[in-house]
Every structure is written in C-alpha cells, then in structure tokens.
C-alpha cells in the first residue's frame, strides 16, 4: 500500500485550508450557486500533487467552507469538489509533465483542459443528482443550480486555474533561450 509522504500531507493540509477559506467568497449567479475563484486551488494543487491530493483537498476544503459558513454540509457538493480535484490531478501523472520542473507541452495543456472540463461536468451532474435523489431537492431548482455551477466552474477553471497552472510551470522552467557568448 502506498503511504502519503509528509510533503503530500502538508500540501493537502495547506490546499484544504486555502480552498476552504477562499470558498467563502464568490459572486452569486443562481440560488445557492456562486462563481468561486477558489476552484483555481483545485487545478493548481491537483497539477502539482496529483489526483489523490486533489480529491482530498476538494473533500476537506469544501467541508471546511460549509462548516465555517454555518450552512449544513451538502455532501453531494462536497463529493463533487473532490471529483473536480481528482480529475485536475490526472495531468500530474502524465510522463514529461511537471509544474515543479516547468516541463510541459501543448498536448499536456490540452489534456489538462479536457480532463478538467470533463471532471467539472461529471462532478456537477453528480451533485445535482445527489441533491434530487438523496436530499429531496426540487428538480427545477437543481437544474438551475447545475447549469449555474457548471458555467461558473468552467469560467474559473479557464480564466484562473489553467492560466495560473501554466504560469507556474513557465516560471519553473530550467532552461532559457539565452546563450553564453565567448
């Protein structure tokens, strides 16, 4: 069985705290649905530390947000944050990709974009279905929430998460195009 390294546990703790606290702020776009810039944390930490870290940061961080805000914990949405973090972490498993070393190519960026978008859609549909089936929420309300949350998460992912992750990788590149003249 693989054990979590100290570094990974610390990263999960920091990522969860950041995601949990930053998740308290957002812009309302539908009933109980917000554009939350905190989603970028799942992209960055998933790309840096992998799917397990992304999953745990999403689960723990969203639980922290709901607890601090005083809302009851909406487990379908907590799990959806975990799913999003998990799928954002797939990129870290690609050979040749490393935010830490600044190694990536256009295919890696496309892969992150596609897996991120698919993960968001799957996660939000899961949360909506969970709310209808388990929580007994009205279908009409959930359709609005699912559409709003999907649009909001896609915007944050494309405008913040993806560019920040690419920017971090670029800043960590080990080589430049500068040449030493003799």
UniProtKB/Swiss-Prot annotation:
<feature type="transmembrane region" description="Helical">
    <location>
        <begin position="71"/>
        <end position="91"/>
    </location>
</feature>
<feature type="transmembrane region" description="Helical">
    <location>
        <begin position="142"/>
        <end position="162"/>
    </location>
</feature>
<keyword id="KW-0472">Membrane</keyword>
<dbReference type="InterPro" id="IPR009825">
    <property type="entry name" value="ECF_substrate-spec-like"/>
</dbReference>
<keyword id="KW-1133">Transmembrane helix</keyword>
<feature type="transmembrane region" description="Helical">
    <location>
        <begin position="9"/>
        <end position="29"/>
    </location>
</feature>
<feature type="transmembrane region" description="Helical">
    <location>
        <begin position="40"/>
        <end position="60"/>
    </location>
</feature>
<comment type="similarity">
    <text>Belongs to the UPF0397 family.</text>
</comment>
<keyword id="KW-0812">Transmembrane</keyword>
<dbReference type="InterPro" id="IPR022914">
    <property type="entry name" value="UPF0397"/>
</dbReference>
<dbReference type="Pfam" id="PF07155">
    <property type="entry name" value="ECF-ribofla_trS"/>
</dbReference>
<keyword id="KW-1003">Cell membrane</keyword>
<protein>
    <recommendedName>
        <fullName>UPF0397 protein BA_2640/GBAA_2640/BAS2460</fullName>
    </recommendedName>
</protein>
<dbReference type="GO" id="GO:0005886">
    <property type="term" value="C:plasma membrane"/>
</dbReference>
<feature type="transmembrane region" description="Helical">
    <location>
        <begin position="114"/>
        <end position="134"/>
    </location>
</feature>
């Amino acid at each position: 069985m693989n054990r979590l390294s100290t570094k990974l546990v610390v990263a999960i703790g920091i990522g969860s705290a950041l995601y949990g606290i930053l998740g308290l702020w957002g812009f309302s776009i539908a009933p109980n649905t917000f554009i939350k810039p905190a989603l970028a944390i799942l992209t960055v930490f998933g790309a840096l530390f992998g799917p397990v870290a992304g999953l745990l940061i999403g689960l723990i961080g969203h639980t922290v947000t709901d607890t601090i805000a005083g809302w009851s914990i909406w487990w379908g949405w907590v799990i959806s944050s975990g799913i999003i973090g998990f799928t954002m972490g797939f990129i870290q498993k690609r050979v040749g990709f490393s935010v830490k070393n600044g190694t990536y190519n256009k295919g890696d960026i496309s892969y992150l974009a596609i897996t991120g978008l698919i993960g968001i859609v799957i996660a939000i549909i899961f949360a909506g279905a969970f709310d209808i089936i388990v929580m007994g929420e009205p279908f009409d309300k959930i359709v609005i929430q699912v559409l709003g949350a999907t649009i909001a998460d896609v915007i944050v992912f494309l405008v913040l998460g993806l560019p920040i992750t690419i920017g971090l990788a670029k800043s960590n590149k080990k080589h430049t195009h500068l040449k030493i003249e003799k």
